Amino acid sequence: MTEALRLWIRHEVRATERRAPLVPADARLLIERGIPVTVEDSPQRVFPIADYAAVGCRIAEPGSWVDAPDEECIVGLKELPDAPAALRHRHVFFGHAYKGQRGGRQLLRRFTAGGGTLFDLEYLVDGRGHRLAAFGYWAGYAGGALAVLHHQGRLSSPLQPAAKEALDAVLARSRRVVAPRALIVGAFGRCGRGAQAALATAGITPTCWGLEETETVDRAALLAHDILINAVLVTEPAPPFLTSADLQDPDRQLIVISDVTCDVTSPCNMLPFNNRTTSWSAPTRRLCDGPPPLDIIAIDNLPALLPREASIAFSADLRPHLASLGSSEPWQRCRRTFHRELARAG
């Protein structure tokens, strides 16, 4: 399989997406193994295209993957552009198409039309179902940081990507004020651990809920916190953590929700009163005027706020698996999941 494998790293069409699935240092390691790597130029990617050229990558124009030979495997992170209507290549990215998300069926139909294959990175898992490459830690870190800053009235917009050191310096100033009561739901997974780390930098010791606490949610206890960070990975519909009626509870202290999971268009949404994302230009949305007022943060590419750190960690996880793309058991599981979902979508 290695002899036939050719990787093509595409430009991300989302203007705020500065991450890379493969960083230059890891591209070099694959090239040294005899795997050709093409990288599209990208005006916003955090790693300059010259860094890829310096390690032996072939450089291509942004969006030129659509004309790439069939044997190229197209690797990205977020959504594809709307064209072409028929997808003929093997694609590796986060498709967000299997849990009833908006646009999921349309994406799968594009693969049906072109005969291509989606290797969805969310479903690149080991035999126990644990994801092998994920941005969760950095999503949690960014989501926790934004929640703290908004609670203190220090979240400015539009959001700008930053280095972790700069963000940490801003968070550290939070230690000068009285710490809010913060709750992390799903505190012990990747996202939750990242949120815990961000809050620790701000001098906040959160309440941490795991599986046991979320089997039967104590909503009164949840509403007694100032900040809620939702970091739970849900794959099947379940009773929500909060409902619209709960937001009107006269005893509610909750004033900031950071929805890191951000399953806003899915039946798996554990915060169903929120059905749309917020954005870098408008990171918060008022859910109710209160008293007290309640705002939500629901940004679906949080790790892009820390693009360098997030990319380096993700690439280190993904690179060993890219070397066996399509042939190893984790990729075979991805393929089987794709064909199962393709059949379900009709």
Functional labels for PLM-detected ranges:
Residues 4, 88, 178-181, 254:
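Phosphate-coordination loops involved in phosphoryl transfer and adenosine-cofactor binding
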Residues 11-42, 47, 156-233:
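Glycine-rich phosphate/diphosphate-binding loop of Rossmann-like nucleotide-binding domains
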Residues 78-79, 95-96, 232-237, 261-262, ...:
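Short glycine-/small-residue-rich Rossmann-like dinucleotide-binding loops
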Residues 211-290:
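Rossmann-like adenosine-cofactor binding region
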Residues 3-110:
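An N-terminal-biased, well-structured beta-alpha scaffold segment characteristic
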Residues 117, 122-170, 262-346:
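Adenosine-phosphate binding glycine-rich loop
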Residues 9, 38-41, 60-61, 75-76, ...:
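General beta-strand structural signal in soluble alpha/beta enzymes
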